[in-house]
Design a protein with these regions (language model features):
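Extracellular/periplasmic helix-loop junction at the C-terminal end of a transmembrane helix
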Residues: 70, 74-103
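Helix-loop-helix "hairpin" substructures at the membrane interface of multi-pass membrane proteins
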Residues: 106-184
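Single transmembrane alpha-helix segments in multi-pass membrane proteins
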Residues: 1-25, 48-64, 139, 157
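Glycine-rich phosphate-binding loops of nucleotide-dependent enzymes
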Residues: 4-7, 42, 104, 144
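Alpha-helical transmembrane segments of polytopic integral membrane proteins
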Residues: 1, 20, 45-51, 72, ...
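Alpha-helical transmembrane segments within multi-pass membrane transporters and channels
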Residues: 29-72, 79
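Alpha-helical transmembrane segments in multi-pass membrane proteins
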Residues: 12, 16-20, 34, 38, ...
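Interfacial loop-to-helix junctions that mark the boundaries of transmembrane helices
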Residues: 27-36, 58-60, 101-114, 182-184
């Protein structure tokens, strides 16, 4: 709904994966708690990023905002490398390692869970955008920001929520990829 291509999206994925990894490995939290705290962290991270860095860019040429997201990508990538290093770190074992046989095809549990999580997110997004007030507000804002604002929709709030959702979904992807491949 912000009409901005986020070139730092991949780094959101990395940040989410590393935050969850740190909560599990360094703080010794159980997976479910570390995962929920990671999602909460990324939600706040997305809102703060939009409010502090991107909101001042409203009204600027779109290329300036795109260049800003490229700069954020470089900044986040360098920060992650500086904090966590360049080496792959294995994620603690979350799902059983054995495979499940589905119609003669052996599928690892982690891949199956990633697929199920993806389906749940898709269904959740469908319901959110179709039936919730905020989902409808986001659709209206994406269609026409001025009309949405004239209807009483807080465009700034919609933008902040869009970036928060983007960060949360990226964190989910980062954690599921990290479980399978490790974090690097």
């Amino acid at each position: 709904s912000t009409q901005v291509v986020n070139f730092a999206q991949g780094e959101f994925l990395l940040i989410g994966a590393w935050v969850c990894w740190a909560m599990l490995v360094h703080f010794g939290l159980p997976f479910w708690l570390g995962f929920v705290l990671t999602l909460a962290f990324m939600f706040v991270f997305g809102i703060l990023l939009q409010m502090v860095v991107l909101r001042p860019m409203i009204g600027e040429p779109i290329i300036s905002v795109i260049m800003l997201t490229i700069g954020l990508s470089i900044f986040f990538k360098a920060g992650i490398s500086w904090i966590f290093g360049e080496y792959v770190q294995p994620f603690p074992s979350v799902f059983p390692r054995e495979s499940i046989n589905i119609w003669g095809l052996n599928v690892q549990t982690a891949y199956l869970m990633s697929f199920v999580i993806s389906l749940l997110i898709m269904v959740g997004f469908y319901a959110f955008f179709k039936y919730s007030r905020m989902g409808l507000a986001m659709r209206a804002t994406a269609f026409d920001q001025q009309v949405a604002a004239s209807l009483g929709i807080s465009v700034h709030r919609v933008f902040a929520l869009a970036w928060a959702i983007s960060a949360v979904v990226s964190a989910v992807a980062g954690v599921t990829i990290g479980i399978v491949n490790g974090v690097s």
